[in-house]
Curated annotation (Swiss-Prot):
Bilayer topology annotation: Peripheral membrane protein
Lineage, highest ranks first: Bacteria, Pseudomonadati, Pseudomonadota, Betaproteobacteria, Rhodocyclales
Name of the molecule in the record: ATP synthase subunit alpha
Residues at the site labelled Required for activity: S373
Keyword Transport: yes
Enzyme class: translocase
Function statement: Produces ATP from ADP in the presence of a proton gradient across the membrane. The alpha chain is a regulatory subunit.
This enzyme's EC code(s): 7.1.2.2
Catalyzed reactions: ATP + H2O + 4 H(+)(in) = ADP + phosphate + 5 H(+)(out)
Oligomeric and partner information: F-type ATPases have 2 components, CF(1) - the catalytic core - and CF(0) - the membrane proton channel. CF(1) has five subunits: alpha(3), beta(3), gamma(1), delta(1), epsilon(1). CF(0) has three main subunits: a(1), b(2) and c(9-12). The alpha and beta chains form an alternating ring which encloses part of the gamma chain. CF(1) is attached to CF(0) by a central stalk formed by the gamma and epsilon chains, while a peripheral stalk is formed by the delta and b chains.
Name of encoding gene: atpA
Length: 512
């Protein structure tokens, strides 16, 4: 077989013409300086705000400052191996994290990578950490309750699905305890939970995870951890990553609860990053957009309509509304709620639960100040049963606080005032609750009904909780059907009320 040179050249030419080479255009630049996890990169022309950048050693960063001749980027993770002159490439993508039910029961970092030693997470989907909140048209009013299992919260500052309720107080006042109890109480209620721990000690986060595992709560919970040992950038990103994971459930017609513990540390992390990027400081050295930092995060918590769920699922899920409820935590310094970050978050949220050091030290736990704690939209979502019975509790506590201040100066009090003070002390005692022991609706209803109708009035204040426990135990044994009815209907009919009154009266006659 003889080869013809002209045929060979024609063959080569045709192969070259038909060559389909997938060319990839990527902008690249060089590192000019690297300090404290912040890199200045020169030569990146087509870079987006918030875009992921690829550094050597499979390390990623995020472009935050777009200047005329350089880009200020924050490194996500270790940065010791990055040096001046290294090549940095754009990716054309905004930062994404894995989402879906595969993450339930796992502990992940701010980038969605597992840190619990239980192997890789085989999530099928990823989503952007920065998303626009649903518009007004796509939202629905808050009308279904989130039962926290805490008497004082569910009766006086109720939380609804899709609400943002702030938990605010000094350090060591039980803020995390309220949030963790709320997660534990969601067992069997079809509510998925996301716990975002920001800037806490790793040992504290491990303790929370252990408690959730002990109470069987990890099976419906995702923990996003950005401990104090992590970089400021990862502490700043953690709430957005957790929110995206929670939004997956909201947008598939499910209900989710997210806890940010706490947003003060996130604001500190963002302040640190902003100052290192040489952004001009404002009040308390925070950057000018610290309000937007929290508002764009908390506005993503909402109750969305069935039309929104249908649109995002491309018509696969019909007739189901979804919700994402947020319980952000803010730590105050010496009770100063007029500081910059606390006032910002108070103005963004739909109410707040104030926890006070004085109450905590006096043994009133949860240390909730009922006078200044409010829920602006939760009242519409409160269960009928608790709404019907809880009104008297708030009134009794309000009158008690007013009289207690007056009684300090008055030596001789009339009988009516003395009774009211005694009743106030009793109700305050009954609002106490041990940690990790949330109550069901029916148990709460028994306490509220008995307190409202004066069944505890002849009980010593120090024995009130003992009496309450015995009463609930008695009714569970002897009036099991009534308790089941109250739990399932979440209402109290006239007939049920008669049975309840008879049951409590029978218990009181036997209790000493």
């Amino acid at each position: 077989m003889q080869l013809n040179p002209s045929e060979i050249s024609e063959l080569i030419k045709s192969k070259i013409q038909n060559l389909q080479g997938a060319s990839e255009v990527r902008t690249q630049g060089t590192v000019v300086s690297v300090t404290d996890g912040i890199c200045r990169v020169h030569g990146l022309q087509d870079v987006m705000q918030g875009e992921m950048l690829e550094f050597p050693g499979n390390t990623f960063g995020m472009a935050l400052n777009l200047e005329r001749d350089s880009v200020g980027a924050v490194v996500l993770g270790e940065y010791e191996h990055i040096s001046e002159g290294d090549i940095v490439k754009t990716t054309g993508r905004i930062l994404e994290v894995p989402v879906g039910p595969e993450l339930l029961g796992r502990v992940v970092n701010s980038l969605g990578q597992p840190i619990d030693g239980k192997g890789p997470i085989n999530a099928k989907l990823t989503d952007k950490i920065e998303k626009v909140a649903p518009g007004v048209i796509w939202r629905q009013s808050v009308s279904q309750p989130v039962q926290t299992g805490l008497k004082c919260v569910d009766s006086m500052v109720p939380v609804g699905r899709g609400q943002r309720e702030l938990i605010i107080g000094d350090r060591q006042t039980g803020k995390t305890a309220v949030a963790v109890d709320a997660i534990i109480n969601q067992k069997g209620k079809g509510l998925f939970c996301v716990y975002v721990a920001i800037g806490q000690k790793a040992s504290t986060i491990a303790n929370v995870v252990r408690k959730l595992e002990e109470h069987g709560a990890m099976e419906y919970t995702i923990v996003v951890a950005a401990p104090a040992s992590e970089s400021a950038a990862l502490q700043y990103l953690a709430p957005y990553a957790g929110c995206t994971m929670g939004e997956y459930f909201r947008d598939t017609g499910e209900d989710a609860l997210i806890i940010y513990d706490d947003l003060t540390k996130q604001a500190w992390g963002y302040r640190q990053v902003s100052l290192l990027l040489r952004r001009p400081p404002g009040r308390e050295a925070y950057p000018g957009d610290v309000f937007y930092l929290h508002s764009r995060l908390l506005e993503r918590a909402a109750r969305v309509s069935a039309a929104w769920v249908e649109k995002l699922s491309n018509g696969a899920i019909k007739g189901k509304t979804g919700s994402l409820t947020a319980l952000p935590v803010i730590e105050t310094q010496a009770g100063d709620v007029s500081a910059f970050v606390p006032t910002n978050v108070i103005s963004i949220t739909d109410g707040q639960i104030f926890l006070e050091t004085d109450l905590f030290n006096a043994g009133i736990r949860p240390a909730i100040n009922a006078g200044i704690s409010v829920s602006r939209v939760g009242g519409a979502a409160q269960t009928k049963l608790i709404k019907k019975l809880g009104g008297g509790v708030r009134l009794a506590l309000a009158q008690y606080r007013e009289l207690a201040a007056f009684a300090q100066f008055a030596s001789d009090l009339d009988e009516a005032t003395r009774k009211q003070l005694e009743r106030g002390r009793l109700v305050t005692e009954l609002m106490k609750q041990p940690q990790y022991s949330p109550m069901s609706i029916s148990e709460m209803a028994v306490t509220l009904y008995a307190a409202d109708k004066g069944y505890f009035d002849d009980v010593e204040v120090k024995r009130a909780l003992e009496c309450e426990k015995a009463m609930i135990g008695y009714l569970k044994t002897n009036c099991a059907d009534l308790m089941k009815t109250m739990e399932s209907t979440a209402d109290l009919s006239a007939d049920s009320e008669k049975q309840l009154a008879a049951g409590i009266a029978a218990f009181k006659s036997s209790w000493v």
